[in-house]
Amino acid sequence: MIFRLTARSGTGLAAIMMILATGAACADTFDVIEATPLKEVWLNPGFYSYHFQRDKGLNDSNPGIGGEYRFSTVASATVGRFYNSDRAYSSYAGVYYQPFAIGPVRIGAVVGGFNGYPKMRNGGWFPAAIPTLSYEYQRVGLNLAIVPTYKDRLYGALAFQLKFKVFE
């Protein structure tokens, strides 16, 4: 599956680059995280999406319910359901793999499946690999997914997901 970022996503890309540059400037080093076992449960209330194509009338508010089971310092399983950008309900299941860090920000991707997008496989399930950044502090965290545009079927966005640790 080939993704492309459109010219209109330049503002979003500039914002991402500024975030990464700021993190790199503040951090002592770029680190490879050592994988050690964990048992943490996080819950989230969905997403807020800042779409690159602002003229499409897409839904930026994506409420829902999701969970993340962090079984390692570098990996976690995730599942959830939310009201998507196309104003339809979507479900997802996947695995975050984030083996790198710049300061307190973990870097990697979430790989899994999504459904509910009418223009993508008629709303059926499809695979996706999405770059992600994560920051966690005690019982609160934030996942930032950098969702690329895919043809005229999926619209690119910066997807912000607030999460809360409920068990460790």
What are the functions of these language-model segments?
Residues 41, 73-77, 103-105, 133-144, ...:
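Repeated loop/turn-to-beta-strand initiation elements of outer-membrane beta-barrel proteins
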